Structure formats: structure tokens, C-alpha cells
Amino acid sequence: MSSESQSSSSGPSSSGSKMKDFNQRFRDLHKLRQRARKENHEQVVEEDRRSKLPKNHEAKKERDQWQVKELQDRKAAEDKGLDYERVRSLEMSADVTEKLEQKRKRKKNPDQGFTSYEDMTLRQHTRLTAALDPDLDSYKKMRECVGGEQFYPTADTLIHGNHYPTTAAMDKLTKDVHGQVKRREQYHRRRLYDPDAPIDYINEKNKKFNKKLDKYYGKYTEDIKDDLERGTAI
């Protein structure tokens, strides 16, 4: 009689505890489901936001961050009384510094090769104008010596034979003309050359063809190329 009463008393308690554990697990699963649902929704919203951004947004963002860091480093160097360009050059390797200098020159007056004679003339005018180094002291002295009427001629002013260039000015002109002749003789469309890049072409035409192939199929053949370079069996 006592054993029956004990079994009857333990039965409802065990079933109740099982039900309680089941309800707890169900609530935990429900919370996990709600959390996953929320995170998925946030990711979908973020992907939709990124898809509506310009294609160069990430690159522009990285460039802005790099510019901000450069300004901060430049200010820190100035506060310490150091030359920022020299400090940056010491932190970089020589080849990287050379590439950055070439990139800066191309950005200042980019050479896109021959397009038209008008563009070539404009580039030459821009380069020659940037190379001008006016001597204001000589300018003022010449104006005082010649006088305002002769220095600022009109249609009735005779200026033939009144100008006597200095020796330094003539040397500068001669040097510039010789430089123009040398550049004209050696002119060619400058192409970027990376000495560390792998040589997988036999001529210029084959090089262009390989670039086109790599553009469309490079991601599929990268593993095969690595295996061939290592000598691993395919």
C-alpha cells in the first residue's frame, strides 16, 4: 500500500518537472529564433544599403581615412619639429617611395599618351607655366629703371632693342630648350613597369591577351597556376 502511494506521489512531480524543462527549452529556442530573425533582418537592411551606394564608396572611404591619418601624422611631426616627408620616407622602402613619387608626378600632369596636338600643346603650356620662377626683385628694378611708360608699352611705344636679358635668364632658356629637344627625341608613351611582376608573356600583344584572360578567368585558374609553380601534381 505504501509503495503504491509513493509511486503515485512521484509520478506527477516527475512529469511536471519534465514539462517545466520542456517549456524552458522551448522559450530558449524561441529567443534564439527571435534573435536570429532580428540579425538576419539587420543584415538584409545593411546589404540593401550597401547595394544602393556608389561602386567606389569603399575605396573612397578608405582614401578618406588614409587622408585623415596622414593629416594627423603630419601635424604630429610638425609639433615635434620634424619634416613629415623625410619621416615618411624613412618608414618606407626605397621602391615604394619611388612608386609614390612617380604616381604624384603623373597625377600633377598626367601623360595619357598622344591624343591630339591640342592636348600636347596644352600639356606643354601647363608644364612650362609651372616651371616659371619669376624674380620679383629684378622686375621691380627694371620697372624703376625703364619707367612706367616704357615698361607698360602701348600701341605707340617702340620697344625694339630696349630689352637686355640677363645671362642667368639666357642660360635658363637654353637649358629648357635642350630639355625639350631631349624629351621630344625620347618621347614614348610611358607604361608602368613592375620588376616584381611575373613574366608570363612573349611579346606586347601576348601580354595584352593574357591580361584579358586573367580578368575573366584569373580567379578560376589561380590554384592551377600555384600548383604549377610549386610543381605539385594536378
Swiss-Prot record:
Biased composition regions of type Basic and acidic residues, renumbered to the chain: 18-80
Alphabetically ordered keywords of this record: Coiled coil, mRNA processing, mRNA splicing, Nucleus, Spliceosome
Gene: syf-2
Cross-referenced InterPro entries: mRNA_splic_SYF2
Record carries keyword Cytoplasm: no
Coiled-coil ranges per UniProt: 19-78
GO cellular component terms listed in the entry, alphabetical order: catalytic step 2 spliceosome; post-mRNA release spliceosomal complex; Prp19 complex
Official protein name in the record: Pre-mRNA-splicing factor syf-2
Functional summary from the UniProt entry: May be involved in pre-mRNA splicing. May confer protection against toxicity induced by heavy metals such as arsenite, possibly by negatively regulating the expression of phase II detoxification genes such as gcs-1 in intestinal cells.
Domain of life of the native organism: Eukaryota
KO phenotype (gene knockout): RNAi-mediated knockdown results in increased sensitivity to the heavy metal arsenite.
Record localization: Nucleus
Subunit: May be part of a spliceosome complex.
Organism name: Caenorhabditis elegans
One Pfam family linked to the record: SYF2
Biased composition (Low complexity): 1-17
Keyword Nucleus part of the UniProt annotation: yes
Region (Disordered), start-end ranges: 1-80, 96-120
Family indicated by similarity: Belongs to the SYF2 family.
